[in-house]
Amino acid sequence: SYVRVCFLGEVSLPKHECLLYSHACSSSSCGVSPVIAYSRLWLKRALRAMNSSYSRGMSEAAKDTGAVLIAAFEGWNDACQAATNAVRHLVKRYESREIRHIRCDDFYDYQVARPMLCHVSGRTNLIWPQTTFYDITLDAGKRIYAQIAPEPNYRWKEYCSQSLAIADELDVNRIITLGSMFSDCPHTRPLPIAVSDGDCQCEGDRSYNGPVGIPTVLDVAAAQQGFAHSSMWVSIPQYLGSDECSAGTIRLLDALGKYIGFIFDTADLKQKAEQWKAQASILVRCNDQLHDYVEHLEHDYDLQQKAEAEASLGAPQAEQLVKEAEAFLRQMGN
């Protein structure tokens, strides 16, 4: 169940890769030995894994080297469409073209992810749910790839395998997944954003236990295949419903831009974000109970920000501030 590849020694193959290897051994194409071709694939992955391990000791500035794939998925991982709208904004704002698709039949329940009917120039068309990959040119010296799709209903492992095979073809070095989730946070403050770097096992990454969506599964699969990987999640106020949240989209794009060393143009989103915030403020003013709730969230948010600022300076009172924040959260829970 392994292939011996040059000086790298033994490279273990997952079960589905063993099946692919067996199939390769029984056929050939383009006059190249399938065993050699498959060994090349695993040599490439092994070298990527070695490079990923080496890069962990390098500076943060090194993270913007190599091809990057940005992935976002509709559904459970996409509160108020903040994550998928980030990808849609990049596709619309910058020069982009569709370069790959993943067939939809094996991955979707059409009673959940239904096809859409549309009429164009007098003709009736059905648009089926599918995964689309884009090549996006940001400027003369920088390009990224993007993946957008409804969250699959079935066969997540196979779906991730196909996604990463395409990333392999595109010579992608890093996978960055985007997500948005409803949370107890006020609309009157910058929306909280969490950036998890697969190269750094931070305490926050180990604190969650519970169900996950396809972005997390893709992160794990990417790590297993030697890709560098990161994830970015923005929190959306749960009391405002499911209308599109441009403020959340901007937060993701700002974090992504900082990470890869590029400033994204979000001018057209900022006006929508201001409208979203103004409408939320009107709603809060018209509901006394909601007004009190938001005030509690603001107090909690400000206390946490103060504690983090003090902790970053190494001040002795930081631990006390953290305890106060935890006590306040327990009081809200009761």
Please give the residue ranges for each predicted region.
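Internal, conserved structured core segments that host functional sites
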Residues: 150-198, 218
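Extreme N-terminal basic, low-complexity initiation segments
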Residues: 1-11
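N-terminal short beta-loop-beta anion/metal-coordinating cradle
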Residues: 51-151
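A conserved C-terminal secondary-structure "cap"
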Residues: 240-334
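Catalytic cores of processing enzymes, dominated by hydrolases/peptidases
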Residues: 183-263
